[in-house]
């Protein structure tokens, strides 16, 4: 019999009780994070190409989609998920990245439908010196511009999810 890897979004094919089906997406996020970490390591040695950035974007897309999985598996957490995304700029920005790479025009952004992913160069360093000219991601925040190192941004999103899952999703039921 062939090994089953998944495919039934939230159906019985996951082999998990409905309230635990978010775990399939969390495991996927962790696998994509490993790929993003490999890209980070590569960025210290050599210039990244478009396919490298595609992998980091795919990680962020899976990171945002975790929200849907948690909400569908544990509807009672919707208000806490809303509060999490309202409190942390980075998670709203993660949503914008997810939707911005999926749709040509983002109609209801969390922050900035026209965010930018770019490389910032220090002209006093060797041109293209790996690890010294970071890939940044920038979002408009009102009249201000918020810039993040791309890999620090991915770290923050992962840390926020890790904390939320430990504190709210996996925590014992409140009585």
Regions found by a protein language model. Name each.
Residues 32-35, 62-69:
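Amphipathic, well-ordered alpha-helical segments in soluble domains
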């Amino acid at each position: 019999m062939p090994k089953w890897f998944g495919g039934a979004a939230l159906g019985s094919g996951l082999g998990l009780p409905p309230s635990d089906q978010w775990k399939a997406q969390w495991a996927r996020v962790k696998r994509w994070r490993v790929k993003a970490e490999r890209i980070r390591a590569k960025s210290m040695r050599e210039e990244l190409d478009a396919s490298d950035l595609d992998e980091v974007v795919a990680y962020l897309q899976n990171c945002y989609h975790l929200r849907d999985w948690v909400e569908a598996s544990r509807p009672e957490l919707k208000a806490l998920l809303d509060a999490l995304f309202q409190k942390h700029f980075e998670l709203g920005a993660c949503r914008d990245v997810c939707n911005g790479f999926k749709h040509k025009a983002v109609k209801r952004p969390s922050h900035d439908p026209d965010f930018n992913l770019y490389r910032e160069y220090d002209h006093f360093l060797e041109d293209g010196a790996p690890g010294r000219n970071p890939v940044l991601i920038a979002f408009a925040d009102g009249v201000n511009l918020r810039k993040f190192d791309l890999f620090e941004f991915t770290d923050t999103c992962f840390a926020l999810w890790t904390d939320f899952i430990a504190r709210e999703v996996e925590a014992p039921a409140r009585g």
